[in-house]
Amino acid sequence: MVQGTTSDAGKSVLVAGLCRVLARKGIKVAPFKPQNMALNSAVTKDGGEIGRAQAVQAQACNVEPTVHMNPVLIKPNSDTGAQIILQGKALSNMDAVGFHDYKRVAMGTVLDSFAKLTDEYESVMIEGAGSPAEINLRENDIANMGFAEEADVPVIIIADIDRGGVFAHLYGTLALLSESEQARVKGFVINRFRGDIGLLESGLDWLEEKTGKPVLGVLPFLHGLNLEAEDAITAEQELSSQVKLNVVVPVLTRISNHTDFDVLRLNPDINLRYVGKGEKIDKADLVILPGTKSVRDDLDYLRSQGWDKDIQRHIRLGGKVIGICGGYQMLGKLIDDPNGVEGSPGKSEGLGLLDITTTLTDSKQLTNTHAQLCLNGKTANVKGYEIHVGRSEVQGAQPLRLSSGEAEGAISECGQIMGTYLHGFFDEADVLSLVSEWVNGTQIKQQDFEQLKEKGINRIADAIAQHMNLDFLFK
C-alpha cells in the first residue's frame, strides 16, 4: 500500500507506475483505493462510478476498471457536504460528521471489494488518501492505516521533495503512527527530485538511521506526464508559434471532470485558458462551460462574477459557446430541483441561450456512450461518457445522434451555442477538427490522447525501474 505524507505527494502516479512495472512482467495486477475524494470520475464498464485516477491505474494494468477498484468515492457538493458513491452507485448526501460516523459501516464494503480483487488478481496495488497522520481522522479510518491494519498489508510512504521539508514530512509522519502501524511501514520513497543526488545522500543516511526504515528510491521530477488529474486543475501548456484556437473555461466552485479539457491543453495549436474568480471571459474564440457537482449554486456563482454578461458579449461578437453536462444545463432556460438533489429544493433561471429545460432527479445517468456529431453538414464520431442527474427537454435541433438512435444535446438557432451531456467530447481527433472548423474555420489536427497517456505511464514505470529498489519492494 502506498501512503503519502500529504495530498499530491505522488501516490496516484507511483501506484500507476508500479502497476505498469508488474504488468510488463506478465503479472495480473489491479489498482485499489479504499476511499477517494474527487470530482473527476470515470464510468466503469458495468455502469458504476469511480475516481478517475483509478481508471488511469487500471489502464496501467492493462485491465478494464471496475467499481471494486474504488469502493468509496466522495464527491463534494458544498463546503461541508458530499455525495457518497458506494461500489459505483450513489448512496446519499452526507455532511462531514455523518460520513465520519458512517465509515465504521463502510469498512465492510471496502473489505468486500478488496477481497474480490485479491481473488481475481495475483497482485493488488493499493493507494491511500491524503496522509495517515491526520490525527482528527484516525477514528474509523478506512483510507490509510485503518485499512492497512484490517487487511494486513505492508506500507510504503512517499513524500514530495519539491515542496520542501521532505525529511520532516517523512520522520514526522512515521512518528505520529502507532507502534503496530510503524512496524507495517517497510520504507520511504522521495518524489520529484531534481539536482545532484549526491547532495541528498547525507539526508537519506540520517533518515534511515533515525527511523530504521530504508529509502527505497528517489524518483526524478517528471514533467509533462499527460495523465488525468485526480482533482487539481493542470494549466501547464506548450504552445506553437501560431495558435489557431483560443479557448476559455470559467472555473466554477464545484467544477467536475475538467479532464475533459486535457486534450485541448495538450494541443500546441490551442491556447486553453482557465478563468478564475475576479477575472473576465475575453479574448476567446470558444467559451466552454464545464461540468459541476452543484449546477444551481455554480450558476449563481457564474452570475456573481459577471460571466453571464461576458458570455453574452462574446456571442454578440460572433464567438461560440459549448456547455458540457452541468454547463449544458446552465445554458438552458430553467433548472428545476424539486427534490433537493443538489441542495435546497427550488428552481433557477438558466442563461436562456438554448431552448431546453432541465429537471434534476434522484437517479443518476452513468454510461459509456458512442455518438455521431453533425455540424455544418459534416460528421464525426464521438466516444464519451455520461455522469449526471436530471433530464433535459429539448426544443429544436440536436447535433448528436447516440448509437441507440436517440438524439442528444442541443444547438441554438443562430448556430453559435451548443450543449451536450457527453464528457470526453473532445477526445476523438475528428471531433476536435470538426469543432475547430465550426468555431473559426481552422483545421486542428489532434494528437492521439490515448497514446499520450500510454507514453506518460511508461515514463513513470521506466523511472521506477531505474530509481527504486524493486527487488526489496516485491520480495
From Swiss-Prot:
InterPro entries in UniProt: Class_I_gatase-like, CobQ/CobB/MinD/ParA_Nub-bd_dom, CobQ_GATase1, CobQ_N, CobQ_synth, GATase_3, P-loop_NTPase
GO terms, biological process: cobalamin biosynthetic process
Matching Pfam families: CbiA, GATase_3
Segments forming domain GATase cobBQ-type: 244-431
SUPFAM superfamilies reported for this sequence: Class I glutamine amidotransferase-like (SSF52317), P-loop containing nucleoside triphosphate hydrolases (SSF52540)
Superkingdom assignment: Bacteria
Coiled coil, from the record: none
Pathway(s) where this gene product acts: Cofactor biosynthesis; adenosylcobalamin biosynthesis
The entry's keywords: Cobalamin biosynthesis, Glutamine amidotransferase
One GO molecular-function entry: ABC-type vitamin B12 transporter activity
PROSITE patterns: GATASE_COBBQ (PS51274)
Residues forming the catalytic site: 325 (nucleophile), 423
Family statement drawn from the similarity comment of this UniProt entry: Belongs to the CobB/CobQ family. CobQ subfamily.
HAMAP family assigned: CobQ
Function: Catalyzes amidations at positions B, D, E, and G on adenosylcobyrinic A,C-diamide. NH(2) groups are provided by glutamine, and one molecule of ATP is hydrogenolyzed for each amidation.
Name of the molecule in the record: Cobyric acid synthase
Lineage: Bacteria, Pseudomonadati, Pseudomonadota, Gammaproteobacteria, Vibrionales
Gene: cobQ
